[in-house]
Every structure is written in structure tokens, then in C-alpha cells.
């Protein structure tokens, strides 16, 4: 019996393990006008304060909404919460709609993208200044690409089964080590996610704004596409940071990761220094380091812990270890009114359980570079017949199909185990359905949306058609988890909470930033 099979059997003896997976969702979506253009209006007051609202905030731009669910154990509850949030938001948007694709709608110029505003508090001003820095460093267009983030953790019973009884400090160390094992395996095999669920094979030519690219795009009107691409969002055209390529951040342990991250936020950038930090009394960025703050680090998956007041993400991890992981490589699903569906959530359950139960050897920089090259191939040409991927750094290759089948052989066993514990056949059904997509790439989301784009005559028309449909769906939706009263109450609470923060402000902004970044002066 393999170690994977042994570990699965150990966990299977505690069926309650599978009932207590913790999941949360974050979905980004641009507000757009009936004409199909990015909206210029401020974040609607009827949605509450973006700074303090628990479920509805903004990401980079005023027009880029972000919907956040709390943590739940039931898949149905998770999706009901997200549907309710979409319903409430759409009722407050007038004739504006939510863009249903990851790649943005028509953008006349970068200057038309208004940075997200969070009020007059130092916290709020710092959030906007961070975005000003991103704009000056990378341009605004890259920042308004939308995605879905999936937050996930295993219950204590899962770790009990794997590790037995442990003291608290030993348990936390074991959990952190295991989550970093998940992260390494995600880099190794996570290309399956853009293969199956990537949904950005095309973009509007306005997105390039004259930038040169060597990619062999084909065109439909003003839409550019790659025939076998799965996720241009995850390509070099999407959210990546070439300046970060110099960083040496490893994933072999929490200590190695934190050391790399702490070095990164202290690494000066000659390129970003040329932009200036404060010029003629006006701030242009938080600082001129490679990363202004830790959140700027690009990653398809992140180790996370809920932060305490005033705590940076790395401080939270150093204090108490990894609490959950954040999967960040999901495109918005254009065939769902809420950007993700039940099949995807259940597949992620299976896949993340598999990455935790499988062996996960340490990974050096060379190996990580090889895995990243596999990701690059899959996002640009994942549906290409006979596409070969590297197995490590030793010249061995395997077709995507052959490798995916090996993974699904294990996923089927996990699906059987989970269904036996939970009752029904939901996981086996999802596994069987998605396995057919391996030999039939035309069934993948990227192939389906590309077919729609060709049928409609472009990305803009496709997005508008789907956006119209989902506006109606979201408006007609009946609350399943929340209520109108709860939603209105959160609007009032968040608005008051922002006012309270602003009223208590005592430091001027310069002093606040000096205090916040005091850690950069400290010895790491």
C-alpha cells in the first residue's frame, strides 16, 4: 500500500473529517455601464463602506467590487451566501451590471480607472496610496483583471488522524509543515486548475494599450485570442510582476517562507526608486522596495492566518502558524452568475485533500522554475493536442493528458472515500464528469467561452450578453441564507464603523506611515 493510500485510510476511519472542511470565497467583478464600458461612478453608498463591510468591498478600483463569504462547512451554504450577496449588490446598482469575465471590458484609457477610495482615515488613505503605487509600477489595466479566491482549511480531526495526539505547539508546527506540503504540490500539479477552469483565452485589444507582445494572437474584430489558451489572466499579460523574479522565496518550511518574505519587503528596487516616493508633497507609492507591503507578492496560492489588529500577514504566521490556504488561480467562471459553481468547489476539495495526503518532497529553486514553466505552457496552450509537460528538472516529459489521468486515478479514490463518509455520490460524479474533460478539451471552460466569443463576434458582446442574463438572475434570486434586513444592517454598521475610525484619528498621515513602516528600519 502506498503512503498516500495509508494516509487516506487513516483519515477515512474518521468520517467526520470530511464534514468539517472550512471554505470561504472571494469573487471580484467590475461594475460596467449598459454600453459595455467600465463605470466611472464611486462605490455606491447603498452598499456600505468598502473599508469596513464584511461581505462587500472593493479591490484595486472603485469599479472593482469584491464579494466575500464568511467561512462555512457546507458547500450549499457557501454558494447560497455568495448568491445572496450578489442579489443584494445588484439591487443597489441601478442599470449597472457585473462583468462576468476575468479579463476586463472595454477600457478607453488607464486614466479612466479610478482608484478605490476608503475615506479620510490613515488606514483608508494608506490602502488608496498602495493602489497608487501599483498603478505607477505596473499600470492600472493589469490590476482590474478579476478572479475568484478559494480559502480552505482542514478540521482538527483531520490532523488528529494524521498526527495523533500532540501538544499545541507541536500540532501547529505539524500543520504548518503539512500546509507547505500542500503548497509545493500545488505548484507541481495545480496546472490542472487552469486546464479545467481557466476561462480567459481572449482579451479586448484595448487591454494591451499599445504594449508589444510576442504571443501569436488571432483576432475576432477587436478581440484577441490564442486558440489553445486557458487563462491569459495567469500569463505574463495578466497579474505578474517581473521585478519579483529576483526574489528567493521558498516553500519548504514556514521559516524559509517568512525569511524570504521579510527579505522581499526590505529589498530596494532601483526601478521603483525612479518613480519617487513623495514628490512635491504628493505620495506616489508607500516605499520604493520591490514589495511595498506583503500583499504585493504575486502567488497562485498563499499560506494564511487571520490577522489581529495592526498585525501584518507575516507576523500572524510567525505568531501562530498556518491556519488556512488561499487558492488564487481561479478565473471567474463565465457560466455562473456568481463566478464559481458547485462542481468547482467539490473538485477543489478533492484536489487539496490529495495534495495534503500525497508525498511532498522539498523543492529547490530549479524545480520550482520547472513547475512554473509547466503552468506557463498550460495557461497559453493547455488545450493543444499532445502538449508535453516536464516532470521535474531532469528532462523527463509526459503529456498533459497522461499526467492528468494519473492524478484523477487518486482523486477517484478520495471521492469514493468522501462520498462514503458524507452519503450520496456528489464527489464521484464531479470526478467522473471532469475526467472526461481530459480527453475532450472542448468541454473545458476556456474552450466553451472561446466558442461563445466566436459565436457572438467578440469578447465585449459575449460579456454583455452574459452580464444581462446574470443581472436578471441575480435580481430574481430569493435570499437563501441572509435576509434583506441583515444586508441593510451591515450597510449601516459598516458606514458607522468607518466614521468611528475617522473620528478617532490622531496622527497625521506622514507620522502614521513612519510608524507603520518602522519594522523596515528594524533588524530582520
From Swiss-Prot:
It catalyses: L-cysteine + L-glutamate + ATP = gamma-L-glutamyl-L-cysteine + ADP + phosphate + H(+). Its EC number is 6.3.2.2. InterPro entries: Gln_synth/guanido_kin_cat_dom, Glu_cys_ligase, Glut_cys_ligase. HAMAP family: Glu_cys_ligase. NCBIfam families: glu_cys_ligase. GO terms for molecular function: ATP binding; glutamate-cysteine ligase activity; metal ion binding. GO terms for biological process: glutathione biosynthetic process. Keywords: ATP-binding, Glutathione biosynthesis, Ligase, Nucleotide-binding. This is Glutamate--cysteine ligase. Belongs to the glutamate--cysteine ligase type 1 family. Type 1 subfamily. It holds the Pfam family Glu_cys_ligase. GO terms for cellular component: cytosol. It comes from the Bacteria. Pathway: Sulfur metabolism; glutathione biosynthesis; glutathione from L-cysteine and L-glutamate: step 1/2. The keyword Iron does not apply. It comes from Vibrio cholerae serotype O1 (strain ATCC 39315 / El Tor Inaba N16961).
Amino acid at each position: 500500500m502506498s503512503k498516500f493510500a495509508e494516509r487516506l485510510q487513516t483519515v477515512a476511519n474518521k468520517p467526520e473529517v470530511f464534514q468539517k472542511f472550512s471554505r470561504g470565497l472571494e469573487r471580484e467583478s467590475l461594475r460596467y455601464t449598459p454600453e459595455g464600458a467600465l463605470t466611472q461612478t464611486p462605490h455606491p453608498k447603498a452598499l456600505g463602506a468598502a473599508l469596513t463591510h464584511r461581505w462587500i468591498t472593493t479591490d484595486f478600483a472603485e469599479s472593482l467590487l469584491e464579494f466575500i463569504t464568511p467561512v462555512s462547512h457546507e458547500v450549499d451554504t457557501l454558494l447560497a451566501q455568495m448568491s445572496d450577496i450578489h442579489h443584494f449588490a445588484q439591487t443597489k446598482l441601478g442599470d449597472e451590471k457585473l462583468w462576468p469575465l476575468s479579463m476586463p471590458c472595454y477600457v478607453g484609457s488607464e486614466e479612466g480607472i479610478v482608484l478605490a477610495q476608503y475615506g479620510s482615515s490613515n488606514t483608508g488613505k494608506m490602502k488608496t496610496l498602495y493602489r497608487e503605487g501599483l498603478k505607477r509600477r505596473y499600470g492600472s489595466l493589469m490590476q482590474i483583471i478579476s478572479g475568484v479566491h478559494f480559502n480552505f482549511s482542514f478540521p482538527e480531526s483531520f490532523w488528529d488522524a494524521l498526527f495523533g495526539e500532540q501538544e499545541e505547539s507541536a500540532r501547529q508546527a505539524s500543520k504548518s509543515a503539512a500546509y507547505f506540503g500542500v503548497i509545493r504540490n500545488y505548484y507541481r500539479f495545480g496546472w490542472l486548475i487552469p486546464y479545467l477552469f481557466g476561462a480567459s483565452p481572449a482579451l479586448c485589444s484595448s487591454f494591451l494599450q499599445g504594449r508589444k507582445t510576442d504571443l501569436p494572437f488571432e483576432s475576432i474584430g477587436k478581440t484577441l485570442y490564442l486558440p489553445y489558451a486557458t487563462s491569459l489572466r495567469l500569463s505574463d499579460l495578466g497579474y505578474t510582476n517581473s521585478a519579483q523574479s529576483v526574489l528567493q522565496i521558498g516553500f519548504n518550511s514556514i521559516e524559509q517562507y517568512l525569511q524570504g518574505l521579510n527579505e522581499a519587503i526590505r529589498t530596494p528596487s532601483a526601478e521603483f526608486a525612479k518613480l519617487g516616493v513623495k514628490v512635491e508633497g504628493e505620495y506616489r507609492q508607500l516605499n520604493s522596495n520591490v514589495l511595498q507591503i506583503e500583499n504585493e507578492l504575486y502567488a497562485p496560492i498563499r499560506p494564511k492566518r487571520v490577522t489581529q489588529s495592526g498585525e501584518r500577514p507575516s507576523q500572524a504566521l510567525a505568531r501562530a502558524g498556518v491556519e488556512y490556504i488561499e487558492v488564487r488561480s481561479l478565473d471567474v467562471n463565465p457560466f455562473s452568475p456568481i463566478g464559481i459553481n458547485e462542481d468547482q468547489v467539490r473538485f477543489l476539495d478533492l484536489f487539496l485533500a490529495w495534495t495534503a495526503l500525497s508525498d511532498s518532497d522539498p523543492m529547490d529553486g530549479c524545480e520550482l522554475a520547472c513547475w512554473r514553466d509547466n503552468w506557463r505552457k498550460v495557461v497559453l496552450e493547455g488545450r493543444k493536442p499532445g502538449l508535453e509537460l516536464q516532470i521535474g528538472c531532469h528532462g523527463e516529459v509526459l503529456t498533459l493528458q497522461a499526467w492528468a489521468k494519473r492524478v484523477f486515478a487518486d482523486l477517484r479514490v478520495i471521492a469514493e472515500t468522501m462520498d462514503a463518509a458524507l452519503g450520496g455520490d456528489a464527489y464521484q460524479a464531479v470526478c467522473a464528469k471532469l475526467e472526461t474533460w481530459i480527453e475532450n478539451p472542448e468541454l473545458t471552460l476556456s474552450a466553451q467561452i472561446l466558442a461563445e466569443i466566436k459565436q457572438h463576434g467578440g469578447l465585449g458582446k459575449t460579456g454583455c450578453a452574459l452580464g444581462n442574463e446574470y443581472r436578471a438572475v441575480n435580481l430574481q434570486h430569493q435570499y437563501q441564507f441572509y435576509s434583506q434586513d441583515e444586508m441593510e444592517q451591515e450597510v449601516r454598521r459598516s458606514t458607522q464603523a468607518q466614521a468611528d475610525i475617522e473620528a478617532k484619528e490622531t496622527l497625521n498621515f506622514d507620522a502614521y506611515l513612519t510608524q507603520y513602516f518602522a519594522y523596515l528600519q528594524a533588524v530582520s
